Amino acid sequence: METPVRETDLPPVVISGPPKTGGLRDRLLELLPEGGNLNLCLTCGLCSAGCPATGGEDMDPRKFLRLVSLGQEDEAARSPWVWQCTMCQRCIYACPMSINIPQLIYYARESWPRDERPKGIRGSCDQALKTPTNSAMGVRPDDFTFVVEDILDEVRETQDACKDMEISINREGAEYFLNQNSREPATEPDEMVPLWKILKTVGCDWTYSDVGWAAENYCMFLSDDKAWEDVVRNKVEAVERLGCRYWLNTE
Amino acid sequence: MTATYDALVVGAGVAGIRSALDLAGTGQKVALIDHSPHLGGLLVQLDKQFPTDNCGMCKMLPLTERESSSQFCMRKGLFHSNIDILLSTRLESLEGDPGQFHAVLRKHASFVDPTRCIGCGKCAEVCPVEVKSEFNAGLEARGAAHLPVPQAIPNHYVVDLDNCVRCWRCYDACPTKAIDFKFAERESFNILVADPDPQTTADLAEWLKKQKFPIEGPVDGNSVLERAAEGKDVRLLILDMSLSDVSPERVLSRCLELNARLPVILTGTPEQAEAARLLEQGALAFVEKPLDRAKFVPWLDKLYMRIVSDEIIEIDAAAVVLAGGFSCYDPSEVADVLGYGRSPGVVTSLELERLVSSTGPKGRGLLRPDGRPARRIAWLQCVGSRDLKKKADFCSSICCMISIKEANMVRRLTAEQEGGPAETTIFSMDLRVFGKPFQSYLDEAKASGTRFIRSRIHSIIPDPADPGAVRVEYLDDAGVLQVESFDLFVLGVGARPPAGMNELARAAGIETNEWGFCKTMPFEPARTSRLGVFAAGSFSGPRDISESLVMADAAALGASRLVNIYAPLRERRPQPEPEFRDVTRERPRVFVAVCSSCPMVESRLDTDALTRRLRAMSGVTGVALVDRACTSQGWDRIIDKAREVDPNRVVIGACMPYAYVPRLHELGKALNLNPALMDVCDVATLTALGGDDGEGTDSEVFSRLRMSVAKLLGADPRPTAQARPASPVALVAGGGLAGLTAALAVADHGYEVHLVEEREELGGLAMNIRRTLDGEDPVKHVELLIDQAGKHPNIRIHTDSRVALHLGRAGRFFSVVNTPDGPVPVEHGAAVLATGGVESKLYEWGFRVHKNVMTQQELEQRLADGTVDTAGLNAVAMIQCWRSRDEERNYCSRVCCQQAVKNVLELKRRRPELPVFVFYRDIMTYGFMEHFYTEARRTGAQFIRFSPDNPPAMEHRDGKTIVSAFDPVLGRNVEVHADLLALASGIEPADHSEIAEMFGVEMDEHGFLKEAEYKWRPVASTKYGVFVCGLAKGPANMEESIAQAQAAAQRAVRMLHEKHLASGAVVAEVRHSLCSLCGKCIEVCPYEARRLSPTMDKIQVDELLCQGCGSCAAVCPNSATILRGYSDRQVLSVIDAALEETV
């Protein structure tokens, strides 16, 4: 037996004519160079073998792509699996045909009505939009400043090597503008310290800002283009306000 | 001086060797060169090949005229009287036109004098350098002084100058002073410095004091020119770009005009970019100033060694064959995902070959990196193939079979281990088993327990639970993610153009294709873009051995055709056959000559005592010590001394016995004595290896010479069989593409050809094909061939005719052709069977009942003639492997997937939105055809794999065919409501039973004509003198059929060229009175030289086919089979001589 035949209740995919136009697939074919190479799939399974979301919702990247290729794009896009993708890009990184599966997933997510998209992601995006820090956890500017200073004091006191450590917030003209995932200041503040030490060791000239410092961007994961843009713009403005040369994003 | 050859063959791997042997076999002089220091190319590293699981390279050696060539294992080496082999040699330039090429070759020095090297290895022991060993695929280190391959004969150490650190330790360690680093010549290596800055000269004089190079300078441009004009001795010119009185360009070009080989080094600031342009005009190198002493001095010293020891060889040749082979993809660039170079348990397929070889890296073997036995071994296919990202939109064609073979090797090697053979798993996409015997090979591998999983692997990581192993995740065939650990993970690396391809292409003036391999011409698979230059083997694309040899034959044929225009082979006077006297009735008189100047003889051998002891032997009539037997003066002395005693047996004690084979022929002529009554015995190795004090050397050498004397005393002195005259005519059966191609190729060599076609028209199956995958027009090509054949003065065409009778043996056949005008008798020396194949007939599944069901070939025709209206179609389905690769017909028809892809592209060109579904088992678009499969997918056509135990189901409803199949990717059925269904029917052999019986050739299990040996003799039938090609031999596309036809023609020409066919001196005979007709000898004969007589009462030996291997004599229970030259009595007396107490 070469191929174990699995019992399946799913109805067959029926092909009786040219696929309908104007769907997800066409959008990809139009927008990406070479159509994101969508048609080139060798069905080799490499993407699915390397995908952290394989197996969830009985779906994997190869199967997802196959559904789209066979014109079953509505079924594919409707699968809750699209929300399990982490956008890590491991698939396209190793795909011998450079097929842009993450982009396909992005468009599939977009096809969901906003209020039906997963609450967690949506909530995080909304939260980020509400605060000038863009923190998905709602950390406010003054909270952030307090936590950073508090941890800095503690480190200076307890660690000899850090006695003279300086952290600046809102310092204009620093070379680097450092972003920080808001999970750290909100729940694991000690986790910020290792990076500080590295930056100190290499003699980096950097600063935090009390706004636009949150590195995460759930609006991207939500496939909400407008909100994603708003968040990025706010962060860029924060960088430009301080006149930093580099924006160091840790996400 | 310029040497003149008929052909130059570049690359001495199997393809180059085969081309060279082909040409040499038709009396052409060949120069065979290779850039590496050994023969055999990649094959020296591979112990076994698929699908035979053994080696068999020696089967390429000539079967007749055997004495012109060496007759031993080809992994060790090759000698042929018509082939000059130049190793460590590259082609630098190729000027001129077809028929009169002028080639410049550069032979890199090995710095070891082969006449002095005794292979003791002391140089390698002391060498401090450690670089990756090429032979063991980098799995162990070698020194700069090293032995390139362990098995070569003769085998000398070489110094690899690029990696040498110039410590000279090997020079001091060599006991025979074989290593020459050109110390003495340094003092006469005049270096002229033309640099306005006097500091440069002063620096160089100081820095190079130890090297003892005479430095002269600084001089200005005018004085350089003066010196050059006077022809004063300058060995190297250092020319600075800031020279002002004469421009550096002018100095350079004038100097090179006067002495084209003057080495010139340019110096200058980095900004002096014009230097780069000058480099192209012939300067050796550009060195940036300021000069860095630590780098410049060793660099210059190495350059000096190259200049004084490299040899520039100029040759004239009528034609050139390029057989540069291929290289393996280096997976280091994907180390981040596949772990190669990071996890030691990840190896390439070539490395695995070395790990399981008996000559593999010391202390490795089939072990995990932590030293435990490797019990779980996996292979991953398509590493560096079928991958757009790696610019490899092609299939490497050979890796699937290599991995299956390696799995077999591993299972055999580990069969005795506790727990049975190791677990073997192959991860792949399509399994490309498109060669005729490959499907059965795959089936056997599956049956023996190798697991095949259809998944490429994303990443290979160290196993967190077992650091000696690696871990992968993959989708199983049911689409479920699995995690598994393996002890070794083998990357089936794809093919790439050979290293140095660009330089070779530039030197040879040929174009490359978009993947960097040699570009070839449509319908001329061996022709490169340059007339008179041909491509052999895998130089024009990845191929297995069998196909490489076909391409080598085809390339040789192209070269030979060209050579023949300038110096017709038929008109060449053959070497007069020497007549030897009959010494049967004479008492043996043995003459023994011992070379006294082999490196260690003088110090370790008591030559007086040896002479005395040899003289005392019965039958020995003369003994002579000869100085430098390897030189022609030394050889003349042997002849003189031998004439004095008039011997009828001759033993020569010297070095390198194999090198003396052509010399023995000279001696035979001089003494009028058959060389079969002569023997060369290696005394040099014995003296070299006999312990440090040489104790025991005397008796060892004496014992060895005594064995040779005993062997000759027992030799059968009867003259060897008389040569049979060959008839210079060929018969070609079949007038399709292959038959026409073969007939024209033979006829162009001046031989008469009878072309016999059953049907009324020539052309065959190719006339049904409208277009090749590359867009060429086959019908036009075949019509051209028909026209050429019709006009050819040497071709007689018999259409509507059949061969009715065929008798005789190779070289002299007699056939009768029944033509509409009556029977025509033909006497011919060789036959080519190109009797073709047929598209399989389909009867089931609505074929011939429903109008919308047709074969792929019909679809092509109907698309071409407009009887299929693509505008009215809603969906098209295609089913591949409809009648191939099942129990009934267990081979891949090769052409169907190409045909399907071609039809897909045409349908999609006309109707891009039309759904086209191809149901397949494995898409077999091997080689560069993969590109068209990629393009077919790019159009949006869908390819759905089915398993043979669950084929697509069909239902005809309302003029449509509903094809329903399980898609393993989705895990559910796909149903295509097709207006049109195309079935790949496959290729079947024509009915060959009559022709096979008449010509006495065998058919394989499928009904195709069987090759004598699939791998090494791919166009020879099982009957000597009868060759097979095209679809008669097995499924093939047009290019492949053409190459096979040219190969078959090449073999036929080789046979017709031999005005006399003579067997070798060592052949088997049967003493019929002792024979019990048990037939064991017939089974073991690897050359099919034995058969039961038609009267069923005798075992017959075809002495042309018999190669004297002795397998028959070994299995014969009654000693009824004897090997001439190896009688029992003779062999026993040799053993006695070896064991006899030394007095």
Segment roles from a protein language model:
Chain A
Residues 1-84:
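Ferredoxin-type iron-sulfur electron-transfer modules and their immediate structural context
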Residues 38, 55, 68-249:
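Iron-sulfur-cluster electron-transfer modules
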